[in-house]
Amino acid sequence: MLEKTMRMNYLYDFYQALLTPKQRSYMSLYYLDDYSLGEIAQQYEVSRQAVYDNIKRTEAMLEEYEKKLSLFQKFQKRKQLMNQLKDYVLQKYGEDKQLFDMIKELEELE
């Protein structure tokens, strides 16, 4: 469950601009603010089932966006390569502060 929540949080971060305001709100409340379906339903004066259906549809949309655009997958790959680069530089060029500063700048761009 935690892995799914983390994945949805990342997908939401990458693709939230493609969602409707209501979809953004439901997803934000459910995944970021940890509201229950009942709490969201009460806030929007709709049924719990309506909230559940909306969230499930939105999750499917986010997965479809990721399938087509791969922003999260590319992010993970860049992060992995950055870690490998840091390890390599540490082993081969451990004394080169300028090189470490440049890597740090690259990391901060993410």
From Swiss-Prot:
Signal peptide: none annotated. InterPro entries: RNA_pol_sigma_r3/r4-like, UPF0122, UPF0122_fam_protein, WH-like_DNA-bd_sf. It comes from the Bacteria. Pfam families: UPF0122. Might take part in the signal recognition particle (SRP) pathway. This is inferred from the conservation of its genetic proximity to ftsY/ffh. May be a regulatory protein. PANTHER family: UPF0122 PROTEIN CBO2450/CLC_2298, UPF0122 PROTEIN YLXM. Belongs to the UPF0122 family. This is UPF0122 protein GWCH70_1086. It comes from Geobacillus sp. (strain WCH70).
